[in-house]
Amino acid sequence: MPTATNDGVAIHYEVDGPTDGEPVVLIEGLGYGRWMWRWQRERLADEYRLLLPDNRGTGDSDVPEGPYTMAAMAGDVDAVLADAGVEAAHLVGASMGGMIAQQYALDYDRAATLTLLCTSHGGEESVPIPEETAATILEVPEGYDERETIRHRMEPAVSDGFYDANPDLVESIVDWRLAGDATEAGRNAQAAAVQAFDVGDRVSKIDQPTLVLHGSADRVVPVENGRLLAEKLPDGDLEIVEDGPHLFFIEDPDHVADRIREHLFANPIEAATDAGAGGGD
């Protein structure tokens, strides 16, 4: 597996798809490993050159002492692109990954487009995680083993009935999470970056074509955050996924992949770079 280095931190990443495809970076959410993108990977790797980095603290990447910052994790993405020899790429980020993508677009100049799923620009204007969801994540029933704890904490991120309808898939997800998610220390360090993230007064400087996808039934990052984000983006396109939970891209992967393809097809990298898209201010 290729490895990039940012300020002494090793960031491992996978590459999939044709070498001549337009590069697409799939950026993980808080604590989640590369498994979270397996559905989009299956649907996009026929056409696009996919880069899937493990965030610092996650999977095969280093776990430096926290707290982390979104700026440092955006730097990790740039290190991956530099290591892979990529001058311009489409960035797709979910939840914390969407925050990293926003930070990247503000700090660096390789982002041609953004696709931001179930995310927020942070800060006081953003709508916080509901208290009930926070309690579910933090208050694990006594006696739960590691697998039961993962299922319990993930429940607010999926639709009601998802567990009952997909028992085998849920068990596979638990397996993947045990194998590739962040360590506890890494997750806590990432959570500190999310807590401190606030680009509400700068997000209007992101001029790349940006698709914002958000589930209307998101119990982790309420849908109002997607609306606020899209309103501030100069070239933002918002789609609310009706009844979609936080992990709507797992539950309805075909629709999400179709929307990503449409967005990337409408905004090819050559056109974006010719227009001078990019932050780095």
Predicted features by range, described:
Residues A74-A89:
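Conserved acidic catalytic loop of the alpha/beta-hydrolase fold
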Residues G93, G97, A101:
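Gly/Ala-rich beta-loop-alpha elbow adjacent to hydrolase catalytic centers
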Residues E125, E146-Q195, G200-R202:
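Conserved alpha/beta-hydrolase catalytic His-Asp/Glu region
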Residues R219-N225:
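Conserved alpha/beta-hydrolase "acid-adjacent" motif
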